[in-house]
Amino acid sequence: MKLYAKLLLCSICVAFIAVRWSAPSFNEESLKGARVLVTGASTGIGEQLAYHYARLGAQIVITARRGNVLEQVVSKCREMGAQKAFYIPADMANPSDADLVVKYAIEQLGGLDYLVLNHIGPSPYQMWDGDVQHTRWLLEVNFLSYLQMAQKALPTLEKSKGSIVVVSSLLGKICGPFALPYASTKFALNGFFGGLQNELAMQKSNVSITICILGLIDTDSAMEKIKGYINMTAYPSHEAALQIIQAGATRQSESFYPWYTFYATLFRDWFPYLRDKVIQNSYTYNP
């Protein structure tokens, strides 16, 4: 075996051991009665987040655009054991809605322990067609509203020694095709909240930030988008949601799900030519 191959194998082993041994243990009881706001909670990962928090006995406020669907999710959350469960419809393309949602959650729950930012706006899965306006709109929904909600929630989270949990993507770490506007918003999230982690630490803040890097998850919207473009295993949304909750509860700075997202991020700059070839060959493109 050549030297560089041995070094690579050793690095992988060290990284794996470091991740397995450094992650703090998760105590489900710590979330009993916790005051949680989850965005994008009508379907997909956000819906699963709401159900897990409910099962763990948290107090929940959920938001998304469709009030009728949120009502059904809240009803199920109450059945599953949520101490309290409320919903508020909101459109995160409207800057005033972001403030109103945080204000509503604080009023209903008496404060916040967790702000879980998960919502995204719809975006076509295709080669970029030059539509700058759509990218600008998506930045408002997927990025700027996150900043606005974090800013609004920071004072109450400081008092409760709470956490901001940001649901991001491997596409915010590695450049892939067909989702450029979406990926741009995730790169922006990773950059901003990664920097905010350092600023809060330097200020000795009580607030932690967890950035969750997700790979392909089996939500209905994701499966519909990638059909005919990529053949890759999709991982369960309920497992992704539980991983997000555990990472936030244990105040990890960064979390990766599924396993390959960690290694893809770790080695992305080691072999750029190979990396790009793997990415390009993983997709189907028929001009």
Curated annotation (Swiss-Prot):
Residues folding into a coiled coil are none
Concerning SUPFAM superfamilies, the annotation shows:
NAD(P)-binding Rossmann-fold domains
Please tell me where substrate binds in this chain: 169
EC number of the protein:
1.1.1.-
Q: Which domain of life is it from?
A: Eukaryota
PANTHER family named in the record: HYDROXYSTEROID (11-BETA) DEHYDROGENASE 1-LIKE B-RELATED
Q: Which family is this sequence assigned to?
A: Belongs to the short-chain dehydrogenases/reductases (SDR) family.
Write the protein's name.
Hydroxysteroid 11-beta-dehydrogenase 1-like protein
